[in-house]
Amino acid sequence: MSSSSSPKPADGGRLCVLVHAWPRLSMTFVAQELVGLESQGLNLWIATYGKPDAIRHPIHDQLKAEVHRLADKGVDYPRFLRAFFKVRRKPGFAAALALFRRSMKARATRREWRSFARGVIIAAELPADIRMVYAHFIGSATTVARYAAMIAGLPLAASAHARDIWTSSEDNIRDKLSAMDWCTTCTKLGAEYLQKLSGDPAKVHLIYHGLSFDRFPSDPPRRGNADGSDAPVQLLSVGRAVEKKGFDVLLDALSKLPANLRWHWTHVGGGKILDQLQNQAEALGLSNRISSLGAQDQRQIIDLYRGSDLFVLPCREASDGDRDGLPNVLMEAQSQALACLSTDFSEIPELIIDGQTGVLVPPADAVALTEALDRLIRSPEEREQLGLAGYKRVRSKFEADGGIREIAGLLRKSMQ
C-alpha cells in the first residue's frame, strides 16, 4: 500500500528509510527528523513493517514521502517467494544469505527469519532510484535494513536511540556498526558506548533530537498560584505505561503525600502495564485523584502542558536493561515553561540542571520523589522560576534544525 503523494525523485535519487511502524505516537522525534530531512531537499521512501497507531500527530501528515508497507504480523510468504526469485541472483544476495545462516546458527529465532524475509522483500521492491538504506533504531529495524542493503548493494546507516542500544548484545551492535557507513545517536552516554564498540569510533555521531519549535506555541502561558491548600495542583506525565518510566514509583510517592495536600495527576499514554498501574492506584486509594487519558495527539498534549502546573517523569532502568535516553516529552514540557521533576538518570541531566532548570531526584526513590513533590506542590513561585529557566535553556540549546542539517549532510555524502 502506498500513498499517492510521493515527491518526484531528485537527481541524487531517493533515500530508503526503514522504520518499524509508521505512524507511531511515541516517536515524534522520528517524524520530526524525516519531515526535516524533506525540508532539506532529500527525497524519502519509507519502508515499514509494524502496525501503525490509529491516532496521528499533525506532523505525521506533513511527510510527503511514499510509505511502503509490509505485513505487520509474520511473513507474507507469497510476497517473499516472489521477492526471493527476483533477488537471488543479485551480487549481494549470497553474502546476505551467509549472514542469515551465521545468525541462525548463533541463535535461531523467528525474529531473525522474519528480518531476513523482510529484507529480501524490501530489496526486491526498492524503486530504481534508491541510493541508500537508513534505519531508525539499531535493533530489528537495522537487521532488516542490513539485509536489504546487502542484497541491493547499497550503503547502510542507522540512528540508535535507547532501548535498542541497551537491550542489544555488544556483539550484535559491534557487528552492525561494522557494516554501516555511520551511525547517529541522541545521547552522550549512548554515543560513548557505541564508540567503544565500534572498530571506527569516528563513525558514531552524537546528534541530539532537539525540538522543532515551530510546532509549539512560543509564549509561556499564564499559570495560577495553586499551592495545594485549596485548588489542586495539576500534575502531568506523558509517556507509555512501561517499567522504565517509573510511574509505579510515582504512585508510591503520591500515596505518601500529606492527606490534606490537594493535587491531581493526569497520565497520557497507553502501554502494557496500564492496568497494573490502575490497580496499584486503586489499592493505594488514589483513583479519585488520577486521570488516565490514554493516547492523545500532539495538539491535545500541548494543551495539557499549558494547563498543568508540574510535569513529572521519574525515569529509571527497567529489569531488562531498557532505559530512556533524553525523553522528548521533557523538552516539550519545558518549551511551554512547565516546571519539570525527573530523575538524575541516563541523559536527563544533559537537559535539566538540578535546582536551576528543573528538579532531579535519584531513580526508583519514592521517598525523595515524595519530598520533591511536596515542596514543589506547595511553591508556585519555585515552579514558575524553574519553568521559565527551563523554557529559556531548551529553546536556546535544544533546537532541532542544526542536528537535522548534520544528518542530511551525512546522508548526502553516503548517497554520492
Give the label of every model feature segment.
Residues 169-171, 195, 211-231:
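Acidic anion/phosphate-binding donor-loop and adjacent secondary structure
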Residues 189, 210:
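Carbohydrate-associated surface elements
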Residues 222-255, 266:
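Conserved donor-binding/catalytic core segment of Leloir-type glycosyltransferases
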Residues 268, 275-299:
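Nucleotide-activated donor-binding/catalytic signature segment of Leloir-type glycosyltransferases, i.e.
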Residues 295-296, 303-308:
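Short alpha-helical donor nucleotide-sugar binding micro-motif in glycosyltransferases
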Residues 306-321, 338:
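Acidic donor-binding loop of glycosyltransferase active sites
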Residues 330-335, 339-342, 352:
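Short hydrophobic beta-strand element within catalytic cores of glycosyltransferases
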Residues 354-355, 359-366, 375-381:
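Conserved acidic donor-binding segment of nucleotide-sugar-dependent glycosyltransferases
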